[in-house]
Amino acid sequence: MAKKIVSDLDLKGKTVIVRADFNVPLKDGEITNDNRIVQALPTIQYIIEQGGKIVLFSHLGKVKEESDKAKLTLRPVAEDLSKKLDKEVVFVPETRGEKLEAAIKDLKEGDVLLVENTRYEDLDGKKESKNDPELGKYWASLGDVFVNDAFGTAHREHASNVGISTHLETAAGFLMDKEIKFIGGVVNDPHKPVVAILGGAKVSDKINVIKNLVNIADKIIIGGGMAYTFLKAQGKEIGISLLEEDKIDFAKDLLEKHGDKIVLPVDTKVAKEFSNDAKITVVPSDSIPADQEGMDIGPNTVKLFADELEGAHTVVWNGPMGVFEFSNFAQGTIGVCKAIANLKDAITIIGGGDSAAAAISLGFENDFTHISTGGGASLEYLEGKELPGIKAINNK
């Protein structure tokens, strides 16, 4: 069933509560990556154009004690948003009370207000994170309609998403709608053939994704640290590479049942240490020396993976191919980025988290159909789970 989106709502003169995802990295009070703010702009600008009065909610980090408040205030976000919108953004350094209510009452059509970090409410019994019903009801009372544009928290049942949805007509923002369309589309209505590329450190993080995608994808390419558990399951020598002993049986079982779909590395860049100065050797993936650790996929594997991607109509990628934070172990991830970017007529999706960070930091931001803003949310969506934040959005 299609979900309501913000453009389905009558917004003129309405106080519109918008749950955005402004959980941005900060260093000394400065925003170091504004991607999440940029992604929220289309929804905010649309509501301004339609004459809505916007009340923005977001969390930022984890507020565990009183001393966390000062460094996790959303004030820098309000300032950045004001510059991007080229208009004043009223910032209220509170999450409830008369001051907030009065500021909302003063809003005119097209005005924008940002409420303080919703997780300030976690100091007193985790009211935000545990979806305290009274808090959700109170926040809902501050507006007329609710727009959820925070895909990054869609897998969480919090007061500021599901709690507010319980009491107000709820629609998806444009970003949330995009995530439902692309990430949800892979799971529910994929354009075949589908190739999934899975990387990152651990098999355990991706088990449920693999279990779900193996029934959807035509091929599953496995790289990154998790590949070594699969190579070990085939009886290959992996040296001191990352290994999850307790996942070898899972890998064996998967290879027995779906070996024709699974593509593993054929060569590996190995070294003795995580360093840009480390001595690197490229060796076949079945004979990694006993004192060496696999750090990245090798050049033959990059070519193999690129060949396997040819002809795909949908590609979904989650997890880097190597320790990309070190430039000498980033070539595998760069090679896969290039191979995906070169595909013609394919829907290409990065499922958030480290692979999204890698693609953006390596300069491939504009070469994919969609780069998800959700880490855990993307993974759980790819597992085939119904996410509470999406479930709470009204159907059309």
Curated annotation (Swiss-Prot):
GO MF terms held by the record: ADP binding; ATP binding; phosphoglycerate kinase activity
Could you list this entry's UniProt keywords, alphabetically sorted: ATP-binding, Cytoplasm, Glycolysis, Kinase, Nucleotide-binding, Transferase
Identify the EC number(s).
2.7.2.3
Q: Which Gene3D superfamilies match?
A: Phosphoglycerate kinase, N-terminal domain
Which reaction(s) are listed as its catalytic activity? (2R)-3-phosphoglycerate + ATP = (2R)-3-phospho-glyceroyl phosphate + ADP
Question: For substrate, which residues are the binding ones?
Answer: 21-23, 36, 59-62, 119, 156
Q: Does the keyword Kinase apply?
A: yes
**Chief subcellular location:** cytoplasm
| Record: residues binding ATP | 206, 294, 325, 352-355
One cellular component term (GO) for this entry is: cytosol
Q: How does it assemble?
A: Monomer.
Name assigned to this protein? Phosphoglycerate kinase
Q: Which gene encodes it?
A: pgk
